[in-house]
């Protein structure tokens, strides 16, 4: 089946089904988790960014300087609520004065105060983050499929959708899932730009523009993720550009300037608030394996850990698995796992997970083309089924994630 030039085959239908499962997991989690103070904080700050930024000098919202967080998560959380408020006020405007429901201005208050007037607050606030997780899942599948084939893409996506940490962060307002989305996309977009440079010039600009947007949105989500992605993307870009390496520095400079403009726009072009990007300390980091240790010790990640262990052994012992497609995500994994932020509460270990799943998908795809195909086919199915069961048990509260 073809849809406007896009071929929809069995692999695409399987991927769509898996992404639908992830969306269902997110909706179930959202429905069973009540709103808390963190939700209302994101709603308040996000709505203020869209509706009325703080007039206080040096501050962008009445929440202060957002604890060093980026602006993107607040804007994503507040946008649906702001749109609903505008729709309600617009509809109310066409009623007769005596029939108007919002004359008292209650919709101008906080989300907590207007919770009885605003419908579906829980879903409007949290579903955008779920959609970003689904979007990332689609990107993860597409990258893995292009690199490793249908089986590699299916394995990588299956582990992603059944990872309890992904589901947990995809169902609450936070900067981590957006940084995760942006960092993964930025690294592989940089590789795509390097490949585009080998072709006609007409294909350069769209990919460079896409890289600029990816870096800008990632920086608006989390500055450290953008810095890591910029350095890693530039390194992979330079490695792959080959005869076009003279263009790398120029392109990355323009990308950085464009990304800075996007971050400035995310602060509503308020210069005083924008300067906090450079003084807030959100990019300060050091090294620790404590968070990675917690992930490894959690029983809900057993399937992922078994697959990762097997993939590492195969990569170390089998020459056919040691090529750039597998090495690049492994290098990103090794770079991200030991990071932790010292100024703000963050989870760089989470950003490493899509690269881990890409690495596993690549190595397993290699072995599925070898004489050990039946063994790895059985292992792949067992790992995915086990991880799905553990994920659903975690969601139901039967296992501590």
Ranges and model annotations:
Residues 156-157, 205-222, 333-337:
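Membrane-interface alpha helices of multi-pass inner-membrane proteins
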Residues 12-13, 96-112, 116, 140-162, ...:
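Transmembrane-helix signature of polytopic, membrane-embedded enzymes
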Residues 2-5, 188-198, 227-258, 358:
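Perimembrane helix-loop-helix junctions
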Residues 43, 51-128:
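Interfacial juxtamembrane loops and adjacent helix segments
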């Amino acid at each position: 089946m073809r849809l406007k030039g896009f071929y929809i085959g069995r692999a695409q239908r399987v991927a769509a089904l898996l992404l639908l499962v992830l969306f269902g997991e997110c909706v179930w989690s959202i429905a069973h988790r009540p709103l808390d103070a963190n939700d209302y904080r994101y709603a308040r700050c996000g709505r203020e960014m869209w509706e009325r930024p703080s007039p206080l000098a040096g501050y962008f919202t009445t929440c202060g300087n957002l604890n060093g967080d980026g602006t993107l998560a607040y804007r994503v959380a507040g946008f649906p609520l702001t749109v609903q408020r505008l729709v309600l006020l617009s509809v109310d405007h066409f009623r007769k004065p005596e029939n108007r429901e919002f004359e008292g201005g209650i919709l101008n208050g906080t989300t907590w105060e207007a919770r009885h007037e605003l419908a579906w607050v829980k879903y409007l606030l949290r579903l955008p983050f779920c959609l970003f997780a689904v979007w990332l899942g689609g990107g993860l599948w597409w990258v893995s499929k292009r690199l490793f084939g249908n089986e590699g893409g299916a394995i990588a996506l299956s582990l992603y959708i059944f990872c309890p940490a992904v589901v947990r962060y995809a169902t609450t307002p936070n900067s981590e899932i957006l940084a995760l989305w942006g960092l993964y996309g930025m690294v592989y977009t940089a590789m795509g730009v390097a490949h585009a440079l080998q072709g006609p010039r007409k294909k350069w600009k769209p990919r460079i523009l896409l890289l600029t947007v990816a870096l800008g949105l990632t920086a608006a989500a989390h500055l450290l993720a953008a810095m890591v992605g910029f350095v890693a993307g530039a390194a992979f870009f330079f490695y792959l550009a080959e005869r076009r390496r003279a263009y790398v520095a120029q392109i990355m400079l323009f990308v950085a300037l464009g990304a800075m403009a996007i971050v400035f726009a995310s602060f509503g072009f308020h210069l005083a608030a924008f300067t906090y990007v450079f003084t807030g300390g959100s990019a300060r980091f050091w090294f620790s394996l404590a968070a990675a240790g917690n992930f490894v010790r959690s029983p809900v990640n057993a399937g992922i850990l078994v697959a990762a262990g097997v993939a590492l052994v195969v990569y170390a012992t089998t020459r056919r698995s040691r090529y750039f497609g597998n090495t690049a995500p492994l290098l990103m994994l090794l770079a991200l796992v030991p990071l932790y932020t010292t100024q703000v509460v963050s989870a760089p270990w989470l950003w490493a997970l899509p690269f881990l799943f890409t690495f596993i998908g690549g190595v397993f795809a290699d072995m599925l083309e070898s004489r050990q195909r039946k063994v790895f086919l059985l292992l792949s199915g067992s790992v995915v089924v086990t991880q799905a069961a553990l994920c659903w048990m975690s969601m139901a509260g039967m296992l501590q994630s």
